[in-house]
């Protein structure tokens, strides 16, 4: 059996932020790594708040208000004592000079080198580390918000909002013998209404990054992890981007206030609802002019349409929600559509005391099955039709104690493949990370996680958007583009490679809401032979009756 990776930690003192403590705990309790050394800076504690490195009064005021408006149950930057997992770990101490740079003597370097480390993980992430990078076989790794190039440094999460970037990124960089490269890169939707929330989502999601990379490094053995970029980032000096000044804050609010007023006015005057649109055509649509619209009653949503067929009739299963969302939870309904396009009113088929949506329906060995989204119950549930399409029974909880959304299954090469978006860390984003599992039995008690999980970590393409369909022997996976907002548009992705060790897909088409008049979002694409269904987010005037 292969020996565990030997890991050292670079720490700034006797405390670490919440996100780092959780990451350290996972590493210490993993099956692939042992923490064998803590290198502790003996100087003054540093402030981990990335917004403090500025002399702008307006920016400080902005931060003060943002914090009070957007308090969260978890502060990923709150300091806490080192995890107890480090109590028996050997320690080496550094000293800090007046210019705040670490002073590292050859004796200290030798002590670290003698520990025969595979990886050094820098939790401080604030000072040059080139001289330590030769002390570990795979260099020094550090997590940072930002994309590692354009956005990095002070006030992470602010500049992406300032420049109207649809995504805000986080990364892990590696330094080996003075050369820096990015080995992990993840993209989240930019939360434009709060810099604090935009930044914190990165730290909460980032709890998982270093443990994942250690798992990947363990599987590779002595082979280094591949870089996520074509070249290397040469600089090892202080990060280049400064905090915003007073003039930039004036510009920021002059542009932001009109957008905020427009948003508030639109929300006051219009009610936005999901509606279903469908086309009776066997082919994948190349244009969307001929789609029929199923408009729900006032104060009602019909979303996440999933198509099925029996005999000559089609059935569109939907999430049905009576507004307001704060007082109601959605259930699963079905709309019957005949071959002439005549539809019947929706019929409720599954209702539980928790939210249900995304009723993924499929057929196997003569029976119809459904996997609705039940993330509020922290389950992935499998139902079987006892009288299709109106009667269903729960036959299996595929997974428990998971926060998983939009689960989609496909049968390929003798295996069931289960795609689902998951939130691993409380408070982190749900739209960013796609996980893949496989099993040879639909009713299995164990679904094997793919070794590359998450196979996608990008809000622009991760979250499933409907049935995986086959065209000319090739599988295509619809996915949501959640960069601008949740469920903005749909990607059609060609699955180029999928087996127990690898997964690869490329986008071949992009369906935007502008294809459907009046729509501002589109987040489901369900195709079967003879019917394609989508859902669109359309604004309706609040004060016009029977609209």
What are these regions (language model features)?
Residues 1-356, 360-369, 381-386, 396, ...:
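One-carbon transfer enzymes
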Residues 287, 342-345, 391-395, 448-451, ...:
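Trp- and S/T/G-rich repeat-edge/linker motifs of beta-rich repeat architectures
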Residues 303-306, 357-362, 405-412, 464-469, ...:
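Beta-rich, blade/repeat-based domains predominating
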Residues 318-320, 372-373, 420-422, 479-481, ...:
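Recurrent small/Gly-Pro-centered beta-turn motifs in extracellular repeat architectures
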Residues 321-325, 375-378, 423-427, 482-485:
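Short glycine/acidic-enriched loop and turn motifs that connect beta-strands
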Residues 385-389, 439-445, 494-505:
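Short loop/turn segments immediately following beta-strands, especially the blade-tip
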Residues 451-467, 501-525:
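Conserved blade-ending motifs and adjacent loop-strand segments that build the rim/top face
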Residues 489-498, 516-547:
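Blade-level signature of beta-propeller repeat domains, shared across WD40, Kelch, NHL, RCC1
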């Amino acid at each position: 059996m292969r020996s565990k990776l030997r890991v050292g930690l670079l720490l700034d003192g006797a405390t670490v932020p919440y996100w780092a403590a959780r990451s350290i705990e996972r590493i210490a309790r993993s099956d692939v790594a042992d923490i064998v050394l803590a290198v502790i800076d003996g100087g003054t504690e540093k402030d981990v708040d990335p917004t403090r490195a500025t002399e702008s009064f307006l920016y400080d005021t902005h931060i003060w208000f943002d914090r009070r408006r957007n308090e969260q149950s978890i502060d990923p930057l709150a300091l806490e004592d080192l995890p107890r997992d480090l109590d028996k770990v050997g320690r080496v101490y550094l000293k800090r000079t007046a210019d705040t740079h670490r002073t590292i003597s050859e004796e200290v370097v030798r002590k670290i080198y003698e520990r025969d480390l595979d990886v050094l993980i820098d939790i401080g992430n604030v000072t040059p580390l080139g001289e330590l990078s030769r002390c570990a076989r795979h260099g020094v790794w550090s997590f940072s918000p930002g994309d590692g190039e354009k956005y990095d440094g002070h006030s992470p999460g602010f500049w992406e909002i300032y420049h109207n970037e649809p995504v805000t990124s986080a990364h892990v960089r590696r330094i080996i013998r003075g050369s820096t490269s990015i080995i992990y890169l993840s993209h989240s939707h930019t939360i434009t209404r709060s810099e604090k929330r935009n930044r914190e989502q990165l730290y909460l999601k980032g709890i998982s990054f270093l443990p994942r990379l250690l798992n990947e490094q363990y599987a590779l053995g002595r082979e280094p992890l591949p870089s996520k970029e074509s070249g290397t980032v040469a600089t090892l000096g202080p990060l280049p981007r400064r905090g915003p000044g007073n003039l930039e804050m004036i510009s920021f609010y002059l542009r932001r206030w009109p957008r905020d007023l427009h948003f508030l006015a639109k929300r006051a005057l219009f009610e936005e609802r999901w509606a279903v649109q469908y086309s009776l055509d066997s082919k994948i649509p190349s244009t969307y002019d001929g789609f029929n619209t199923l408009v729900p009653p006032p104060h009602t949503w019909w979303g996440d349409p999933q198509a099925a067929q029996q005999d000559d009739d089609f059935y569109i299963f939907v999430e049905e929600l009576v507004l307001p969302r704060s007082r109601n939870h959605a259930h699963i309904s079905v709309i019957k559509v005949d071959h002439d396009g005549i539809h019947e009113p929706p019929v409720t088929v599954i209702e539980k005391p928790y939210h249900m949506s995304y009723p993924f329906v499929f057929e196997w060995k003569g029976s119809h099955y459904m996997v609705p989204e039940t993330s509020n119950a922290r389950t992935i549930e499998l139902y079987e039709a006892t009288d299709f399409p109106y009667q269903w029974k729960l036959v299996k909880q595929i997974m428990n104690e998971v926060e998983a959304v939009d689960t989609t299954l496909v049968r390929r090469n003798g295996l069931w493949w289960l795609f689902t978006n998951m939130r691993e860390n409380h408070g982190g984003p749900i739209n960013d990370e796609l996980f893949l599992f496989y099993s040879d039995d639909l009713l299995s008690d164990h679904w094997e996680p793919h070794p590359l999980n998450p196979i996608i970590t990008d809000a622009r393409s991760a979250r499933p958007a409907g049935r995986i369909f086959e065209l000319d022997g090739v599988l295509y996976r619809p996915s949501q583009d959640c960069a601008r907002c949740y469920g903005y548009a749909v990607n059609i992705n060609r699955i180029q490679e999928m087996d127990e060790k690898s997964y690869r897909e490329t986008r071949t088409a992009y369906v935007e809401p502008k294809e459907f008049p009046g729509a501002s979002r589109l987040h489901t694409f369900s195709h079967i032979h003879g019917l394609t269904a989508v859902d669109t987010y359309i604004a309706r005037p609040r004060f016009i009756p029977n609209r």
